[in-house]
């Protein structure tokens, strides 16, 4: 098994606390409204804290698919949220687990900087596929931008 680590940042015009609330605390309701491909989010196991497993149902290429998302840690005080993809279409056959350590910090002009560390644990001697990595980054960037756009269009959301 190999572990490969990547880091990325995204900027937003939305304040960190408001963005965190939408991405973490109210995610089950906000994300399906903001991200066209995601149809629903349901808790499969747990109470919303660490260890909780959520099923995200999405439409991709005209097909209904799902991703299993396990919450690893929630740090409201520091606007941190760690989770892993543990099953479904988000997990290629060569990958054991993909973990995300995320944190929001103050950005310019009252906005945010979203920082993420991605750890890919492969099965056996498998190497991460560069194209899969680029596609995953593009999906992550689009997801972050969709939430930002939703919040910009809904200033009443606090």
Curated annotation (Swiss-Prot):
Keywords: Allergen, Calcium, Cytoplasm, Hydrolase, Metal-binding, Nuclease, Pathogenesis-related protein, Plant defense
Pfam families in UniProt: Bet_v_1
Molecular function GO labels: abscisic acid binding; calcium ion binding; cytokinin binding; melatonin binding; protein phosphatase inhibitor activity; RNA nuclease activity; signaling receptor activity
Binding annotation for trans-zeatin 2: 60
Places the protein is found: Cytoplasm, Cytosol
Amino-acid positions noted as binding trans-zeatin 1 in the UniProt annotation, renumbered to this chain: 8, 83
KW Calcium (keyword) present: yes
One of the GO biological process terms: defense response
Family annotation (InterPro entries): Bet_v_I/MLP, Bet_v_I_allergen, Plant_def-hormone_signal, START-like_dom_sf
Residues that, per the record, bind trans-zeatin 3: 69, 81
UniProt main location, coarse: cytoplasm
GO CC term, one of those recorded: cytosol
Entry function: Class II ribonuclease (RNase). Binds to cytokinins. Interacts with melatonin.
Entry's family note: Belongs to the BetVI family.
Protein name per UniProt: Class 10 plant pathogenesis-related protein 2D
């Amino acid at each position: 098994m190999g572990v490969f680590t990547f880091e990325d940042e995204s900027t937003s015009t939305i304040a960190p606390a408001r963005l965190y609330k939408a991405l973490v605390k109210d995610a089950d309701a906000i994300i399906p409204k903001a991200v066209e491909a995601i149809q629903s989010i349901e808790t499969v196991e747990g109470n919303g804290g660490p260890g909780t497993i959520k099923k995200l149902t999405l439409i991709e290429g005209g097909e209904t698919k799902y991703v299993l998302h396990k919450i690893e840690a929630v740090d409201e005080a520091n606007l941190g949220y760690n989770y892993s993809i543990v099953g479904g279409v988000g997990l290629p056959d060569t990958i054991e687990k993909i973990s995300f350590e995320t944190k929001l910090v103050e950005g310019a002009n009252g906005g945010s900087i979203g920082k993420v560390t991605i750890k890919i644990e492969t099965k056996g001697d498998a190497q991460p596929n560069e194209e899969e990595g680029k596609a995953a980054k593009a999906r992550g960037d689009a997801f972050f931008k969709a939430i930002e756009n939703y919040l910009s269009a809904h200033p009443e959301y606090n």
